[in-house]
Curated annotation (Swiss-Prot):
The keyword Transferase applies. The keyword Transferase applies. The active site is at residue 132. It is found in: Cytoplasm. It catalyses: D-sedoheptulose 7-phosphate + D-glyceraldehyde 3-phosphate = D-erythrose 4-phosphate + beta-D-fructose 6-phosphate. Keywords: Cytoplasm, Pentose shunt, Schiff base, Transferase. This is Transaldolase. Signal peptide: none annotated. GO terms for biological process: carbohydrate metabolic process; pentose-phosphate shunt. It holds the Pfam family TAL_FSA. Homodimer. GO terms for molecular function: transaldolase activity. It comes from Shewanella frigidimarina (strain NCIMB 400). Pathway: Carbohydrate degradation; pentose phosphate pathway; D-glyceraldehyde 3-phosphate and beta-D-fructose 6-phosphate from D-ribose 5-phosphate and D-xylulose 5-phosphate (non-oxidative stage): step 2/3.
């Protein structure tokens, strides 16, 4: 019998949730995803020093302002790492817009255009890029405009059905509903332990997946943020799953039969009218877990972006 990872690949597109090139070589995923925390982690790998130096030297040619140089170097480093990863994966790389822009639609769009241009200058077509945006109302609206321009987006930090529905209604290419962080919240809130089947994160992704298929939405569902392989195995059949290196290794070393749990069924109903902004904000606000985890996720990505910029500022000085 093939290992669990090999079996999973027959049901689901496997994506590596890492900026570590060695891990990507080892597990041969279809796509890869990065975020500010992963870029910060990758920047500390000695083999990546040349990518940082290239970003620093490029930024110095773009502006005399140290603040602008720091911003430019951060963008260029994210793209440099993405370019290296694209040499190893046949599919796409997800590169994230600065989390501090999560409530600014226009600046998110502008940042996306900048990232796409940096990739283009490096010889990478936009068809291999997914622009990652937080699933705020502003992020979803930015994604809607970018999708209309032919720039595909990955809406991340997604914790609620309201966010998922709004993304589908906006015509977003892909969503990343988080599994493990939902579990974290419920374990802390209730004091309970959960099986893989009753895991609130697994239940959430399953509900979103079934809703999309039943209503004929084309938005790709990519489960993310896993705490254990039980969650992953329970979502076998999801369009895509983005998995960190430690859990990829555990799956590769696990011999257990994988059964497809999520199965796409033909659309059985027409989609409802799109949520208005007021409806979205109210329904989202009614979910305390989603409110807490979205805010926390944005804060933590912003903190790691800040740490990265401190490192870049030191090198620019």
């Amino acid at each position: 019998m093939a290992n669990a990872l090999a079996q999973l690949k027959s049901f689901t597109t496997i994506v590596a949730d890492t900026g570590d090139i060695e891990a990507i070589k080892r597990y041969q995923p279809e796509d890869a995803t990065t975020n500010p925390s992963l870029i910060l982690k990758a920047s500390q790998i000695p083999e990546y020093a040349f990518l940082i130096e290239n970003a620093i030297e490029w930024a110095k040619t773009q502006s005399h302002s140290i603040e602008q140089q720091i911003e430019d170097a951060g963008d260029k480093l994210a793209v440099n790492i993405g370019v290296e990863i694209l040499k190893l994966v046949p599919g796409r790389i997800s590169t994230e817009v600065d989390a501090r822009l999560s409530f600014d639609k226009q600046r998110s769009i502008d940042k996306a255009h900048k990232l796409i241009k940096l990739y283009k200058d490096a010889g990478i077509d936009k068809s291999r890029i997914l622009i990652k945006l937080a699933s705020t109302w502003e992020g979803i609206c930015a994604a809607k405009e970018l999708e209309q321009e032919g720039i595909n987006c990955n809406l991340t930090l997604l914790f609620s059905f309201a966010q998922a529905r709004a993304c589908a209604e906006a015509g977003v290419y892909l969503i990343s509903p988080f599994v493990g962080r939902i579990l974290d919240w419920y374990k802390k809130d209730t004091g309970q332990d959960y099986t893989a089947e009753t895991d609130p994160g697994v239940v959430s992704v399953t509900e979103i997946y079934n809703y999309y298929k039943q209503n004929g939405y084309n938005t790709v569902v990519m489960g993310a943020s896993f705490r254990n392989i039980g969650e992953i195995i329970e979502l076998a059949g999801c369009d895509r799953l983005t998995i960190g290196p430690a859990l990829l290794e555990e799956l590769a070393n696990t011999d257990v039969e994988i059964i497809q749990k999520l199965v796409a069924t033909p659309a059985t109903q027409s989609a409802p009218a799109a949520l208005t902004e007021e409806q979205f904000r109210w329904v989202f606000n009614e979910d305390p877990m989603a409110v807490d985890k979205l805010a926390e996720g944005i804060r933590n990505f912003a903190i790691d972006q800040g740490k990265l910029e401190v490192m870049l500022k030191t090198k620019l000085s």
